[in-house]
Amino acid sequence: MAGVKILENRIESNGTTIALNDAENCSIESNILVTKQDGVNYKDKNGLTLNECDNIKITDNYISGSARNGASVTDSSGNTLENNTIENVGMNGINIYNGSENNIASSNSVNSAKKHGIAVAANSSAVIKSNSISKAGDTGILIYNGSKGECSGNKVKNAVGHGIVFSKNASGKAASNTVSGAGKHGVLVTDHCGSVALSSNKISNSKQNGICVSNYSSSVSVNSNSISGSGKSGISVSSHSKASL
């Protein structure tokens, strides 16, 4: 399937509102996608799903109420998710997963996701820029499990867990992000990560450390960050990790 435009619809469903499989060069724009939480198909459904799709543009949509992820991108590459509003979802606001490469998530607003605001996982890659993420139930932005993420200009506020995390052999950079009110660390690099650069971030009022590098992570650079109001240390590097400050 190619060249399909899904534009200005209002969809209320007990299951996934829009699902594309094996599609390319399509657009999903200016839709209102609401998952109703009272049907037999509600459990384990995403708001919007891309599976084996390339070059899909997802813009200016409102997504609410899904049991799992607001927008799920699986085994799909070259897709753009921009200027969407995602709120009150059961897992991640945006989930980029399973070898999905060269995707972009920009200028989205993600509020009250029960797990992570934006997650990039399982050998995927994404540019994550200029998003506003608030009240994530765990982590604001998570890059993990062999994935690469370039995070810049994001605002992450009041995450219950960490603000931004690189974990499990992840790599990439976090630059010029604003992280405030994290319930744990503002920015965490952990679990054998390498080649991570943290620069020019503004991190305030983290309950634990502003920046934490731990658990055998190496080749981590920490430069020109502004850190205030941390409950523990501004910057913490464990004895089994290596970082240049």
Set out the residue ranges of the language-model regions.
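Compositionally biased non-globular segments, especially hydrophobic aliphatic-rich helices
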Residues: 5, 14, 26, 38, ...
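Low-complexity, intrinsically disordered/propeptide-like segments
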Residues: 10, 23, 36, 51-53, ...
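Short regulatory "switch" loops immediately downstream of catalytic or recognition motifs
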Residues: 32-38
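Extracellular beta-strand/beta-solenoid scaffold signature
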Residues: 12-21, 39-51, 65-73, 88-97, ...
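Low-complexity/repetitive intrinsically disordered segments
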Residues: 1-9, 226, 231-245
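Parallel beta-helix/beta-solenoid
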Residues: 1, 6, 18, 22-24, ...
